[in-house]
C-alpha cells in the first residue's frame, strides 16, 4: 500500500530547487525589467530581441505584446518553440525560460492582457500607425526554467510538473 506524503516532512532537494527557481523567475520576469526573447526563423536561424512589456501574473503563462506585423510573429507561427532570458541588475542571476508560444489577435484576450501589463512605455510600436489591430499578444506557456548563478557555476532547474498545472490562458 502506497502511503501519502507526510505534510510535516521537508520537501526533497529537487522540489526545493524547483520552488526556488520558480520564485526567482517570477521576480525577474515581473514586468519591471526587460527580457530577451529568442525565436527561430524559417531557415532555422535564431533571432533575439529585447522585450520590455510583459507580465507573468497568470503563471505559468508569460504574456507580452508586439506589432502584429513583426518578424517574431511570423517566426512563432512557423515554430512555436521560444526561449526567454532574464537577469537581475548585477547579472549574477540568470533565468532562462523555454516554452511554446502562441499569437493571439482575439479582442477579449487582448483586453485582458492589456490590463495585466503594468508598464507599456517601452512598447514603441504602439506609436506607429498601422492598419488593423495595434498589437498582438504573445502567450508563452512555460515548460522549463533554468536558473544560473554564473559566479558560482551553479545551475538549478524546474520543468514539467514542477511548474504547476498549465493555466487555461486568458479568455479561454
Enumerate the predicted regions with their spans.
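Charged, gly/pro-rich active-site loop segments
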Residues: 1-19, 96-172
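A short, Trp-centered hydrophobic/proline-enriched beta-strand micro-motif
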Residues: 27-42, 82-86
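Short, surface-exposed beta-edge/turn micro-motifs
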Residues: 32-34, 60-62, 79-82, 133-137, ...
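Short glycine-rich loop/turn motifs
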Residues: 34-36, 48-51
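Residue-level signal for well-ordered, solvent-exposed loop/turn and beta-edge residues enriched
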Residues: 43-47, 100
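A generic structural motif
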Residues: 53-54, 108
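A short mixed-secondary-structure module that forms the rim of ligand-binding clefts
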Residues: 54-91
Amino acid at each position: 500500500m502506497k502511503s501519502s506524503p507526510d505534510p510535516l516532512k521537508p520537501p526533497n532537494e529537487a522540489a526545493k530547487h524547483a520552488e526556488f527557481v520558480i520564485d526567482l523567475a517570477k521576480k525577474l520576469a515581473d514586468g519591471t525589467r526587460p527580457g530577451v526573447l529568442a525565436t527561430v526563423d524559417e531557415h532555422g536561424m535564431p533571432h533575439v530581441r529585447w522585450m520590455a512589456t510583459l507580465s507573468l501574473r497568470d503563471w505559468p503563462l508569460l504574456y507580452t505584446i508586439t506589432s502584429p506585423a513583426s518578424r517574431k510573429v511570423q517566426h512563432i507561427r512557423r515554430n512555436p518553440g521560444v526561449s526567454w532570458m532574464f537577469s537581475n541588475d548585477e547579472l549574477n542571476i540568470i533565468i532562462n525560460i523555454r516554452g511554446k508560444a502562441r499569437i493571439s489577435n482575439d479582442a477579449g484576450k487582448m483586453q485582458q492582457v492589456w490590463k495585466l501589463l503594468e508598464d507599456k512605455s517601452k512598447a514603441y510600436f504602439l506609436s506607429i500607425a498601422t492598419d488593423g489591430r495595434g498589437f498582438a499578444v504573445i502567450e508563452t506557456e512555460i515548460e522549463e526554467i533554468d536558473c544560473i548563478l554564473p559566479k558560482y557555476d551553479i545551475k538549478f532547474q524546474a520543468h514539467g510538473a514542477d511548474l504547476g498545472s498549465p493555466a487555461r490562458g486568458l479568455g479561454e
